[in-house]
């Protein structure tokens, strides 16, 4: 593993909550996935293994399938679609009652730390209108968002929904990235097909969206918030199966919940608060990512050193994006080594715990 990757992993470990007896149910993460339609259900993976409380908000017809995944899931079949709203065919777009139709979900948001939108969502017009209202409300409440799959279509058609909302992560594949860039008129077509070219393209698209963090999936995952670019070069598997992206969105949901706990001081990190009151520069964020807060240990290992100051929010958001990518790629590598060509997205689930321990590991203070 490269030295930059080791340094990033050392910083990721700082935002992972230790397992303490005083924590109670839900403190380490209340995350909901909005997805699951008449056509498809999300393949739920990582967050169900690592966080506190796991919710799925879905269309009624997919609820039974999703419930069969695990008894640990709390499934809420309250997402409306044209199958459940008979008056939609006579209503213009945007739907005049979209806000009212979204109300059962909106009233649920106060219970959540993070919202993941897109896996298995589908493109039903009623559902898309309702999800638009959900994104607006989540943004007003400053709830971190992860948008993938069909949720990216909403961004493509209505970029103002998330423009400038820096608590949001998009996870487009190559095709989705190109569509977003075209819709936003981001000049990326002239970029060379290299890591440097992809980083610049990712940066341009992020800037076109006002600094939203983007993970561009590919042979190496490229991550940018419009100021700082990082690349995840953790080796992945060679098989691409439908549903693998849900492992990424799941891991991001979990990591964002841990990030929230870190910044709210849920446990004593031994760090001093970072100086506030000014906008962070690119150099500030890059210094955070290079673990300049450590007195020594420039290979990224802890070596008993204590960080002097807390990581900034922009830095931890980039770390979440990078760590989600790294864990997903490691799960894919392990699953491919075990199953080869027969590997399916569900095989990644069995590799989650080992991948987490090997890459990040339990933080100091955890008693197992």
From Swiss-Prot:
Catalytic activity: (6S)-NADHX + ATP = ADP + phosphate + NADH + H(+); (6S)-NADPHX + ATP = ADP + phosphate + NADPH + H(+)
Enzyme class: lyase
Binding site residues for ATP: 217-221, 236-245
Organism listed in the record: Ajellomyces capsulatus (strain G186AR / H82 / ATCC MYA-2454 / RMSCC 2432)
Binding site for (6S)-NADPHX: 120, 173-179, 246
Protein EC: 4.2.1.93
Descriptive protein name: ATP-dependent (S)-NAD(P)H-hydrate dehydratase
Chief place of localization: cytoplasm
Keywords tagged on the record: ATP-binding, Cytoplasm, Lyase, NAD, NADP, Nucleotide-binding, Phosphoprotein
């Amino acid at each position: 593993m490269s030295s930059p990757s080791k340094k990033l992993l050392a910083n990721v470990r700082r935002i992972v909550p230790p397992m303490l007896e005083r924590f109670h149910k839900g403190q380490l993460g209340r995350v909901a996935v909005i997805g699951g339609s008449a056509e498809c259900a999300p393949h739920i993976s990582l967050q169900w293994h690592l966080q506190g409380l796991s919710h799925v908000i879905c269309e009624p017809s997919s609820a039974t399938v999703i419930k069969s995944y695990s008894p640990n899931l709390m499934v809420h079949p309250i997402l409306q679609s044209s199958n459940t709203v008979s008056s939609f065919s006579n209503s213009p777009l945007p739907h005049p009652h979209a806000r009212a139709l979204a109300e059962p979900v909106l009233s649920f948001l106060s219970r959540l730390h993070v919202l993941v939108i897109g896996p298995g969502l589908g493109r039903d017009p009623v559902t898309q209108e309702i999800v638009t209202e959900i994104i607006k409300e989540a943004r007003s409440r400053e709830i971190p968002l992860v948008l993938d799959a069909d949720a990216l279509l909403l961004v493509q058609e209505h970029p103002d929904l998330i423009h400038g909302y820096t608590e949001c992560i998009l996870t487009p594949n190559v095709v989705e990235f190109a569509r977003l860039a075209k819709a936003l008129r981001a000049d990326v077509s002239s970029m060379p097909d290299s890591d440097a070219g992809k980083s610049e393209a990712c940066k341009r698209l992020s800037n076109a969206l006002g600094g939203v963090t983007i993970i561009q999936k590919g042979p190496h995952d490229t991550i940018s918030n419009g100021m700082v670019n990082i690349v995840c070069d953790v080796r992945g598997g060679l098989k691409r199966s439908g549903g693998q992206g849900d492992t990424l969105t799941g891991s991001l949901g979990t990591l964002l919940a841990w990030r929230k706990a870190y910044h709210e001081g849920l446990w004593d990190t031994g760090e001093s608060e970072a100086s506030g009151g000014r906008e962070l520069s690119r150099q500030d964020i890059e210094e955070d990512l290079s673990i300049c807060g450590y007195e020594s240990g420039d290979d990224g290992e802890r070596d008993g050193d204590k960080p002097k100051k807390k990581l900034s929010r922009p830095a931890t958001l980039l770390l979440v994006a990078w760590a989600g990518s790294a864990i997903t790629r490691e799960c894919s590598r392990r699953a491919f080594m075990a199953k080869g060509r027969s590997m399916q997205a569900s095989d990644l689930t069995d590799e989650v715990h080992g991948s987490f321990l090997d890459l990040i590991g339990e933080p100091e203070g955890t008693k197992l």
